[in-house]
Amino acid sequence: TEPISQIVKSEMENYQYTVDDLNTMYGSLRSVATEVGKGVVAVHSIQHQVDWFDNPIETTGQYAGVLIAKTKTEALILTPEEAIEAADSIEVVFQDGTVVPGKIKQRDTVANMAVVSIELSALTNDQTKKLTQVELGNSYSVKQGDMVIAVGGPAGIVHSTDYGFVSYVVKSVQAVDGISRVFYSDVQSNSGMGTFILNTNGQLIGWVTDKYDRE
């Protein structure tokens, strides 16, 4: 008799997908992206300068970040290193418009990423309870052909979203003090602003970088 796995595979290959099937599938992905989107924030990099007439001016750069951890006193946000590189001060803006000061917690010049912290005392109890932490996934489980979701700023705007597939996986890429795992995807992306890659369970499995574009 034919193995059950072969029967299932054959049936799936012969199944004719309809527009309704496609809408249902993307509806599920949209739900995942919407839920994770609650943990996406805007990170404002503020520089204090003076104009030609010695008048103080403020310039602001905007980046995307994701809330990756929360303790009793602070929340930690992963964001591109560029967001903190020349910042005199940092502001974190939540999806509901709440603005709180941030401070540099850690930076990784190899990965070009940084962690910004905010004090939970700057939020109300209700706001603290509503903080949505993005769950960390296992990037080593990513396989070629996997569907992925991009959140953060893939379209160059914070809180934009895109969907795509993993095109290729490089399991061992030499990096400073270790080996990195890199995968390529066809999702729209903006590495400078901050684009974060999720699996279909809504878990963070990576972020977009342009370091390996020519390799």
Segments from the language model and where they lie:
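Short, small/polar residue-rich loop motifs at catalytic or cofactor-binding pockets
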Residues: 60-62, 86, 189-193
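Active-site region of chymotrypsin-like
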Residues: 120-134, 162-214
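Catalytic-histidine neighborhood of serine endopeptidases
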Residues: 70-112, 120-121
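Short, conserved beta-turn/loop elements at beta-strand boundaries and strand-helix junctions
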Residues: 48-49, 60, 70-72, 85-86, ...
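Active-site substrate-binding loop(s) of clan PA
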Residues: 31, 67, 103-105, 123-157, ...
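N-terminal activation segment of mature serine protease catalytic domains
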Residues: 2-70, 76-77, 89, 143
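Active-site-proximal beta-strands of protease catalytic cores
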Residues: 40-42, 75-80, 141-154, 194-214
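Beta-strand/loop subdomains of soluble extracytoplasmic proteins
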Residues: 86-104, 143-148, 159-172, 181
